[in-house]
Each structure stands twice: as C-alpha cells, then as structure tokens.
Amino acid sequence: MTKTKIIGILNVTPDSFSDGGKYNSVDKAIARAKEMIDEGVDIIDVGGVSTRPGHTEVSLEEEMERVVPVVEQLVKLDVQISVDTYRSEVAEACLKLGATMINDQWAGLYDPKIFDVVSDYNAEIVLMHNGDGQREQPVVEEMLLSLLTQANKAEMAGIEKGNIWLDPGIGFAKSRSEEKEVMARLDELVATEYPVLLATSRKRFIKEMIGKETTPAERDEATAATTVYGIMKGIQAVRVHNVDLNVKLAQSIDFLKENEHERHHLS
C-alpha cells in the first residue's frame, strides 16, 4: 500500500508562529520528538529559523547553536531527520551528523551550494516555492517554472529525481486567492512526477478556511482536511504540527484509496 509520509514539525525557535519557545531546549525538543515517534511520525523536521511574518533575522552562528545540538541527540532515535534550513553550512553540519533530508524554503535560490552539499551526502531535498510575491505569470505557471528550474539544478548537482521533493509553499509569497488556486491545482504539481510535500499546518490559509478567529492549535482539524484533500490529489507527504491526528487520517485515506485501486484492478 502506498503510504503518505507524515513529517512532524519540531521548531527549536523562540518565535515561531505556532509553537515558538515551546521546544527551544534540547531536552524539551527530544521529549517532543519521542512523542511524535510514538504517534507514528515518519520524518522529524527540525527548524531553527522562524518563517512567521515579521520574524527577526537569525545569524548563521545562532541557527547552528539552535539546531546542531538537537540533531546530535535526534540521530540516536529510530526516525528519519530533516533539517529546515536554506544555508548550506547548516545543511552540511546536520547531514554530517546523520540527518538525511534538507527542507529548503528558498529551493536553493538563497544558497545554491546547498545542492552540492545534499548531493555529497546522497540526501533528500525539499524545494519550496517562494519569492517576493511579484510575478508576471499566473501563480501556478510561475510556481511550476520556478520549482522545475530549481529541481533541474538539483539534478545537475547529482541529486536523484526521487530524492527531490516539491512543496507549493502555501503561506509564502502568495495572495489568498493565489493560494486557493494552487490548492485547487495541486495535481499539476503531482504531474511533474517529483514527490510532492504539502505544508499548510495551522497557517493563515487554514484560519481563513475556518472563517473565524482561531489560535494556531485550534486549526488542526481543518489542517487535517487539507491532508485528506492533498492525498486525494496525489501528494506523498504532509508537514504538520499535530502528528497523531494526521497519522490516523492519512492511514485511513491511504487504505481507502488502495481499496478503490484494488477494486478497479479486479474489474
């Protein structure tokens, strides 16, 4: 059965929009990681730089100090480790320790050396669509062009196609109407035949789906609805805060999709 991967978010930051400060010591971060493993997480994504609107710029040294000690301990656990960074130096330090995936919110545009680093360690990379929000093309066309250009650079650096993930970047450099367009046309990203990761968890897009004022933690059920929708569209992974809920939903949808596939196959 095709299994949708659940990537659990572990922010080791003081200022992330959903859980800033909650896991910003090594002990707290490891305790949360163990909880996620018990809940059935496939990959834990460690981030030391907040992406919330208005976040403070973090120096390379500070990002290293936040992330590396956590990764050093996480690699002792039985789980795949991803690091959410756009800096090749952080990527290299963490891959050297045993991380096997880099989640780059700038898709190699900020630091092109990241492709060579990921290739050297035969690791996976997530390329997220981002930008300044200014575009001359419609959003989906611009997203596809941008991501495929960066994916090609990743392949040229020696990263295997199956190790290159595409993320449509919900919550980044898009208007609300553009985000709705991207969600409706996720299957066009899936059609590129690169594995696709969807990361909507607790974001403003989810808040607007609900249609009323909510805290980030109150957006988990609506986030899970996008998990189901994404799986039906063909995505292969979701990046979420609430691992338990999304594991259960993804397993159930995977089962139902497989059942439908088998019935078609038999007939």
UniProtKB/Swiss-Prot annotation:
Chain residues that bind (7,8-dihydropterin-6-yl)methyl diphosphate: T51, D84, N103, D167, K203, R239, V240, H241
NCBIfam families: DHPS
Record PANTHER family: FOLATE SYNTHESIS PROTEINS, FOLIC ACID SYNTHESIS PROTEIN FOL1
Reaction(s) the record says it catalyses: (7,8-dihydropterin-6-yl)methyl diphosphate + 4-aminobenzoate = 7,8-dihydropteroate + diphosphate
Annotated function: Catalyzes the condensation of para-aminobenzoate (pABA) with 6-hydroxymethyl-7,8-dihydropterin diphosphate (DHPt-PP) to form 7,8-dihydropteroate (H2Pte), the immediate precursor of folate derivatives.
Protein name: Dihydropteroate synthase
Pathway: Cofactor biosynthesis; tetrahydrofolate biosynthesis; 7,8-dihydrofolate from 2-amino-4-hydroxy-6-hydroxymethyl-7,8-dihydropteridine diphosphate and 4-aminobenzoate: step 1/2
GO cellular component, as recorded: cytosol
Residues in Pterin-binding domain copies: 1-251
GO annotation (BP), single: folic acid biosynthetic process
GO terms of molecular function: dihydropteroate synthase activity; metal ion binding
Alphabetized InterPro entries for the sequence: DHP_synth-like, DHP_synth_dom, Dihydropteroate_synth-like_sf, Pterin-binding_dom
Family annotation (Pfam families): Pterin_bind
Lineage of source species: Bacteria, Bacillati, Bacillota, Bacilli, Bacillales
Positions of Mg(2+) binding: N11
Reported cofactor(s): Mg(2+)
Provenance organism: Staphylococcus haemolyticus
EC number: 2.5.1.15
Homology family: Belongs to the DHPS family.
Iron keyword on record: no
Disulfide bonds: none
Keywords: Folate biosynthesis, Magnesium, Metal-binding, Transferase
